[in-house]
């Protein structure tokens, strides 16, 4: 009976079948590692792109904010410069106008200072008693009011005759005078005469009624004086038997003379 001895090569081959070699294990590990590397590479690229996007966005935002700030500063500077220029222009115009007024005033003063004495009107000819020449006044004041000769003189051109009698008045008190006008229809009463008489203690003035004064005809004569126009009014009363004019009583409401 014979026994067969196994071949060591076959045994080696059998064991190599169950236990892979180093080359086979390296090939299997290479196939397992490749997807991990690809995934990590993709993740890294995504992260890098995200960081780049964030950095670029922040830079762009900072640039826009800087441009907007610079634009706002430029606009404010331009507005301030325009406002300052307008204010300077206004001050220049105001100064020019004030300088023009000052120049006009100074030129007027210089003209007045440098003008000769012939340009000035002649001085007033005032006499010792205070009278002023009418011709000088007429030359100096062409629009002056008319004088006495122009109103009541022989060549009167501006005659003015009052249409009604002036109301009664008094410098001290007008109430008794007004009370007396209501009694004008009842004639002259002693009470009214006593009210009209004022004591000299009241400022040194006293009123005298027109009834106590002589008429105009008794003082100046019956005929009108030469150089005066007759005033409208009642005719002088009839003369008495002695040749003296009969005094006519003035109306009770006539004016009072202050003496």
UniProtKB/Swiss-Prot annotation:
Origin superkingdom: Eukaryota
Record field: compositional bias (Low complexity): 221-230
Membrane-related topology note: Single-pass membrane protein
Subcellular location: Membrane
Transmembrane segments: 36-56
Region ranges (Disordered): 71-91, 152-259
Bias type Basic residues, positions: 71-89
GO cellular component term, pick one: membrane
Keyword Cytoplasm tagged: no
Signal peptide stretch: none
Composition skew (Polar residues), residue ranges: 171-187
Tagged with keyword Transmembrane: yes
Keyword terms of this UniProt record: Membrane, Neurodegeneration, Spinocerebellar ataxia, Transmembrane, Transmembrane helix
Disorder association: Spinocerebellar ataxia 31: A form of spinocerebellar ataxia, a clinically and genetically heterogeneous group of cerebellar disorders. Patients show progressive incoordination of gait and often poor coordination of hands, speech and eye movements, due to degeneration of the cerebellum with variable involvement of the brainstem and spinal cord. SCA31 belongs to the autosomal dominant cerebellar ataxias type III (ADCA III) which are characterized by pure cerebellar ataxia without additional signs.
Subunit-level organization: Interacts with NEDD4.
Name by which UniProt lists this protein: Protein BEAN1
Gene: BEAN1
